[in-house]
Amino acid sequence: MPVDFVGIPAQKADMNQAAFFLYNSATHGREPFRPIDPKHVKIYVCGPTVYDLAHIGNARSMVVFDVLARVLRRLYPRVTYARNITDVDDKINARARESGVSIDEITARTTADFHADMASLGNLPPDIEPRATAHIAEMILLIEKLIAQEHAYETHGEGEGHVLFSVASDPSYGSLSNRSPDELLAGARIDPAPYKKDPGDFVLWKPSADDQPGWDSPWGRGRPGWHIECSAMSWRYLGEDFDIHGGGGDLIFPHHENECAQSRCAFPGSHFAHYWMHSAMLLLDGEKMSKSLGNVLTVRDLLGQADGEAIRLLFLKTHYRGVLDFRYEALKEAGKELDRFYRALQAHPALPDLDETVENPVLEALRDDLNTPQALSLMHGLAYAALGGDALAAAQLKEGGMLMGLFTREAEAWFQRGINPDEIAQRIADRLQARKDRNFAEADRIRNELAEAGILLEDGPSGTTWRRAS
C-alpha cells in the first residue's frame, strides 16, 4: 500500500471503481484519479526556461502532458491546463552576456521558437501560459506569507538581500522525492553559503546587481529564486489546491520538492497538487544527453530530418515512465507505421459515426496511466481491420489517434508531405512522351529517378498514378 503524502489518503487502485488511473509520484503508486472538482480539472506543468532551443528530452515531456490534457478533456467537462514560461533565470542572464543580445530579445525569440517546435510536434497550446516576469507581485506576496509564518527568513550582513526557505520548519520536507535528511544535506553541500541557517535552505529571493534583472521588494532590489516562480503562478491561476502537477523526472528534486514545501507552508491545510506525474529520461543512442558530450539534439535539428508527427509517435511508443532510448532507426520505423495508419484511413474517405455508448479501445488503454504503447498496439489492430474493409475500425482508429495528437492532417497530405505534386506531374508527362516516342530507356530512367526519391509510379487503364513508397 503506498504511503500517505502530506495528509492525502493513499488509495488502492481498483479498475472497477474509477475511470482513470495515474501513477502518483507522491505516493509512489498507481491510483484512481479523483479530481477535486469533477466538473473542472486543473493541471500545472513546468514549462521551458527560455534561453536556448528545446531539446528532444524537453519535447518528450511536453508531448506526454499534451496527451494527458487531451484525455482529460475527453473524460471531464472542463480542464484548465497551465504551463509556465520561465523568463528570469541566471542561465538567461549568462546567455545575454555571452551573445551580446538583450535579455528581452533572447526570451522573446526563444519563446517563439519553443511555440513553433511544439506546434510541429502536434502539441496544442495550454489554456494558460504565464510568464514569470509578469508575476513578481504574486511571488513577493507568497514570500511575505512564508516569512510571517516563520517558514522563511531574511539574511543580513554577508548575505544581505537574500530570503531563504527554512527546510527545518517543514516536517514533511523530502516526502515527495522520498529522500532522507542525509541525502538532502548531501545535495545541499554542493553549494554551501555561510548565511544559511541550514545547508539545505534554498533561495526565495536574491539581490540583483545593477546589470542584472531586478524588481523592488521589501528586501531591496532583486529577483526571485527558481522554485518560488512556479508556486506563485500555479496559485494565481489554479488556486491553493489543484489536481495534477507534471514535469520531467529530473525536476522531482530539488525543484518540485521545494515548490511543494513552499506552497504547503504558505497555505496551511492545503495539499497543493494532489497528484504528481513525471516523465522519465530520454537517452540518445544509449547515452544521456549533455553539453559536455556534445550530443544534445534539439527539436529544431530533428525537424530538419523527420516529420514532427513521426517524432511524436516515436515518443509515444515508450510509456512515459519508461526510459526512452532515441535511435534514428526507430524514428524511421515510426514513419513507416504512420504510413500504414494513414493508408488505412485513406481507404475510408467517409467514416461512419461512432456509437457514443461504446468506448473506444484506445481510450480504454489511455485510462490506464496513459498506456500509449498498448494504445498504439490496439491502433495497429484497428488499422489491419480497416485495410480489410472495416469502416467502423477506421473510425475508431481516427478517433483514437486524435486522442494522442496524431492524424492531424488528411491522408493525402501525409503522403504528399515534402513533395511538389506539380513537379511529379511534369515528370509523369515527360515519361509518357518518352514512351510515345518509343524512348523506353528515358521512360525507365524517369521511373527510377522518382523511385530513388521515394515516389512509386503505377500504370493503369486510366493513366499513371503515383504514391509515396512505404
From Swiss-Prot:
Transmembrane segments: none annotated. One of its GO terms (cellular component) is cytosol. Zn(2+) binds at residues 46, 230, 255, 259. GO terms for biological process: cysteinyl-tRNA aminoacylation. It comes from the Bacteria. A motif ('HIGH' region) lies at residues 48-58. Its cofactor is Zn(2+). Keywords: Aminoacyl-tRNA synthetase, ATP-binding, Cytoplasm, Ligase, Metal-binding, Nucleotide-binding, Protein biosynthesis, Zinc. Its main location: cytoplasm. A motif ('KMSKS' region) lies at residues 288-292. InterPro entries: Cys-tRNA-ligase, Cys-tRNA-synt_Ia_DALR, Cys-tRNA/MSH_ligase, CysS_C, Rossmann-like_a/b/a_fold, tRNA-synt_1_cat_dom, tRNAsynth_Ia_anticodon-bd. Its EC number is 6.1.1.16. It catalyses: tRNA(Cys) + L-cysteine + ATP = L-cysteinyl-tRNA(Cys) + AMP + diphosphate. Belongs to the class-I aminoacyl-tRNA synthetase family. Monomer. This is Cysteine--tRNA ligase. The lineage of its organism: Bacteria, Pseudomonadati, Pseudomonadota, Alphaproteobacteria, Acetobacterales.
